[in-house]
Amino acid sequence: MPLAQLVDLWPEVELVHEDTENGHGGPEDRGRHTSKDEVVVKEIPITHHVKEGAEKADQSHFVLLKVLGQGSFGKVFLVRKITPPDANQLYAMKVLKKATLKVRDRVRTKMERDILADVHHPFVVRLHYAFQTEGKLYLILDFLRGGDLFTRLSKEVMFTEEDVKFYLAELALGLDHLHSLGIIYRDLKPENILLDEEGHIKLTDFGLSKEAIDHEKKAYSFCGTVEYMAPEVVNRQGHSHGADWWSYGVLMFEMLTGSLPFQGKDRKETMTLILKAKLGMPQFLSNEAQSLLRALFKRNATNRLGSGVEGAEELKRHPFFSTIDWNKLYRRELSPPFKPSVTQPDDTYYFDTEFTSRTPKDSPGIPPSAGAHQLFRGFSFVAPVLVEEDAKKTSSPPVLSVPKTHSKNVLFTDVYTVRETIGVGSYSVCKRCVHKGTNMEYAVKVIDKSKRDPSEEIEILRRYGQHPNIITLKDVYEECNSIYLVTELMRGGELLDRILRQKFFSEREACSVLFTVCKTVEYLHSQGVVHRDLKPSNILYVDESGDPESIRICDFGFSKQLRAENGLLMTPCYTANFVAPEVLKRQGYDEGCDIWSLGILLYTMLAGYTPFANGPGDTPEEILARIGS
C-alpha cells in the first residue's frame, strides 16, 4: 500500500504544554508548563487542499433521527441524508459549538477534520462531509452500529486472548497507517475504538492527534487520558509515535485483565505510578501475551516495541500474533470474534439509552468570536467518492421486523393491552397481549429486573430470532422494575402438553420432532450459543397443526454465548430433569450439555416420563446419584 510522503504541514504551530486538570505538583509539573489561565496556542490557517465539488453539504441535507452522545462541546446525532448522490444513507453527525470551544479546542477540531479528510483506511472512521454555520461545525462520519469497545468491555469485564489478539491486530494496522502519515494518535482508549456492524474496529475521535511529525521530531503538549499516557507524555520530555504503542499496551492489559495497569486514587498518583511503578504481570496470561506487554511497557521510548524505524512491522513479527494472516486481516477477510446483534439500519442498541431516548434537536449555535471565522476558513469538505459518484437512485432501507428497546418514558401498556397469564417462571411471567394499533395478538414475557438481567437473552433473540424454528422477538420495553419481551404467540401450546395428552409419541413422531429441534440446536451451536434449558415446556408449536416444522425453541433465559477461552461455561443454570452431569458437578460445560438434554427429550417423548425422575426437593447430588446408578 503506497504511503503518503511526510511533510511539515504545521510549521507555525507551537502547542505549549496545556494545563492539567488539577493544580497538583509532582511529575505533571515537570518540563515546560503554562498555568491554568495561560494557555498559549497559536491559531493556524487550514493548509490542506481537499477536493470539493458542487455538492457541498449543509445541515438542511440531513434529517436528525436520534441522539447518539453528548459532551461539553456539542452532540453526536444519527442522521439520514435526504439529497443525492447518497440519499437515504445513514451517518453520524458530530456537531460542535464554536462559541464553547477554547482556541486550543478549535485547533483540535480543525485537526480532526483535516486528519479524517486525509486518512483512508479500513480501520479508521471515514469523514464524508464537513461544513460550518456561523455558530457550529459539522463533521459527517460513518455511523458504526456496534457502539464502542468500552461498552463491550464493561459488559464482559475481560476478553479472551484470541479476542484481544484480533482487536489488537486490526488496531495495529490502523495506528501504523496513521503513523505513516505523520500522525500521533495520542488518545488511544476503548471509548475511541468503535465497532461496525460486522464487528471490525474503527479508530475515531482525532481531537488530540498531532500531525506532521517524523521519527526525528517530537510533540510536547500534555494531552490524552491520563491512565493511557506514556511516561514521556507525563514528564513532558517530548514524545513521538512511540507514545501510542505504550497506550496500545495499556489497552491490551485492560482487555485481558479487566483493569488498568497503572491507576492511583487520583490523577497525581496515577502519573507517579506510570513513571515509577513496577508492572504487576498477571500469571494467568500466556507467555506470548506477557512478552508482548513487557515489550510495550518500556519506559524508555527508544526501546519500546513499535517505536523504531520499522514501526508496526516489529510488532507484527511478535509471537503473540503468530496466527494472524495480516494480508487477510487488512482485507477484512478474518471473522471478528463478536458480531453486534444489529439488523435494522438505524439500530442504536449499543448506544446509551440516556442519549438515544432524547428528542434529537440541533439548537442554533451562539455566534463565535470574530477570530474563529478565520480559524475555520476552508473547513467545508465533501468526500471525493461522493463528488465523483453519479446521482444514483437509492431506495430506503427495508424496515425489518426486529426489536427496538424503547425508552423508559414509553410504557408497555401504552401500546399493548394485557390479557390472561400463559405461564409462570422463576423470574418472569408470560401473558397474552394485544397491540392497540393493529389488534394483533402476541405473547409478552415480563421479567423482574431485580431477579435477573435479561440482556443476554435479548441479544440472542435479536440476533438469531429470524431462524424459522426460534421464537421471534418483536419488541422490548423497559420500565422501572420490569423488562417486557414481546414475542410471537405460540397458539399450538407446549410440546410437553402434547406428550401428556398422547401419553407418549410413536418413534416416527418423536423422530420428526427431534430432527427439527436438532437442526435448530446445531444452528445455535454453530453461532456459539448454548441454550442450557432444553425441555418439552420450552419447545412450543406456533399453531394447532402439530407439524414439526411449526416448532419454536423458546425461553432463552438460561442461554449463553460462549466466550471463555476454552469455550466452557461455569454458571450453573438448569431444569433438574434435563440437566447434564457436568452441569451439576460445575466442572465447566459447553454445547455437550444441550446434547445430553436432547437425549433426555427423546427418552421422554418415547416413554412418557423422564429417565431420572425426581421430586421438587432433590439436590444435585441426589440427581447425580441416579444418573450414575
Curated annotation (Swiss-Prot):
Post-translational modification here is noted as: Autophosphorylated on Ser-380, as part of the activation process.
BP-aspect Gene Ontology terms: positive regulation of DNA-templated transcription; TORC1 signaling
In this chain, ATP is annotated as bound at: 68-76, 94, 422-430, 445
- Identify the SUPFAM superfamilies for this entry: Protein kinase-like (PK-like)
Q: What are the names of the required cofactors?
A: Mg(2+)
GO MF, one annotated term: ATP binding
PROSITE patterns for the chain: AGC_KINASE_CTER, PROTEIN_KINASE_ATP, PROTEIN_KINASE_DOM, PROTEIN_KINASE_ST
Any Pfam family? Pkinase_C
Among SMART domains, the record links this protein to:
S_TK_X, S_TKc
Give the matching Gene3D superfamilies: Phosphorylase Kinase, domain 1, Transferase(Phosphotransferase) domain 1
Q: Which residues form the AGC-kinase C-terminal domain?
A: 322-391
Task: Name the enzyme group at the top EC level.
Answer: transferase
An example of a Gene Ontology cellular component annotation for this protein is: cytoplasm
Keywords (alphabetical) are: ATP-binding, Kinase, Nucleotide-binding, Phosphoprotein, Repeat, Serine/threonine-protein kinase, Transferase
The catalytic activity, as recorded, is: L-seryl-[protein] + ATP = O-phospho-L-seryl-[protein] + ADP + H(+); L-threonyl-[protein] + ATP = O-phospho-L-threonyl-[protein] + ADP + H(+)
| Phosphothreonine: modified positions | 359, 571
Q: Out of the domains of life, which is the source? A: Eukaryota
EC number(s) recorded for this UniProt protein = 2.7.11.1
Q: Which residues carry this modification: Phosphoserine?
A: 221, 363, 380
Name the residues that span the membrane: none
Residues annotated as domain Protein kinase: 62-321, 416-629
- Please give the family membership noted in the entry: Belongs to the protein kinase superfamily. AGC Ser/Thr protein kinase family. S6 kinase subfamily.
List the PANTHER family: RIBOSOMAL PROTEIN S6 KINASE (PTHR24351)
Q: What does this protein do?
A: Serine/threonine kinase that may play a role in mediating the growth-factor and stress induced activation of transcription.
The protein here is known as Ribosomal protein S6 kinase 2 beta
Give the originating organism: Xenopus laevis
